[in-house]
Amino acid sequence: MYHNVGAPPRETAFRGLYVTPHMFTFQMWCLKASGFKVVPLKEILSFVKGDIFHENLASITFDDGYQDFYDNAYPVLKEYGYPSTVFLVSNLVGKENLWDHPKIHGRKKLMDWETIFRLREEGITFGSHTMTHPFLSKLSPMDMVDEIKNSKVLLESRLQAPVEFFCYPYGDYNNEIINVVKESGYIGAFTTRRGLVHRDDDFFEIPRSLIRNSTNPLLFVLRLCSNYEDRRKRTK
């Protein structure tokens, strides 16, 4: 799970979710050198169901839909032929990360529709990260449905393609939220719970490995090739 690939804004106090382009390139090389097969998210669900028996599978996801995905991450993914999924905050496409405190996280540009359409033509897939990136558990039932369901409707209308996967903002979810995600027509949802994907995992509580600026080469390799990351706990 990535957020930003690039340099943080000068005013940004919290820089943990930024990975340098050089480090991202190295990490993609590590996936190839370690014998991993990078697959679309649907194949991860097939692995969970037991329909795929290849053990060294990986999927690459990006939360929020920042412009630096297109500028810095996508060229590397294209070079390696790796698929990836970007989870978009649908009502803020082309704007900035208005959900974050500007003095802590800074203001960062989100991709506009023209860029998203270009990436779609290149095979990048998109998922939903709600309309405005709220803490879903703090919303009224009506507002929760609006954030989850209408984000899917908006994205499918603009992309002219199914939006099948959801990602919980801040890793904030409960049984009520999961039920709304299911009822909205998604086939799977991704958390910020750190860990490896196992057979028989719940399709709507899929864990991920958070890649940060502190994820040095040794840690990255450990996460790929061992249970080091499999701690089964929540992170933002």
PLM regions with names:
Residues 45, 71-72, 102-121, 149-150:
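Alpha-helical scaffolding within the catalytic cores
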Residues 95-107, 134-141:
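Surface-exposed cleft-lining segments at the edges of enzyme active sites
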Residues 1-61, 67-70, 138-236:
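C-terminal active-site subregion of NodB/CE4 polysaccharide deacetylases
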Residues 91-94, 132-134, 172-173:
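Short, catalytically relevant binding-site loops at active-site mouths
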Residues 54-58, 62-82, 89-93:
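Acidic/aromatic-lined carbohydrate-recognition and catalytic surfaces
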Residues 47, 81-103:
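A short, conserved beta-to-alpha structural element at the edge of catalytic cores
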Residues 32, 75-82, 109-128, 182:
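Acidic (Asp/Glu)-rich catalytic clusters
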Residues 4, 125-133:
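Histidine-centered catalytic micro-motifs
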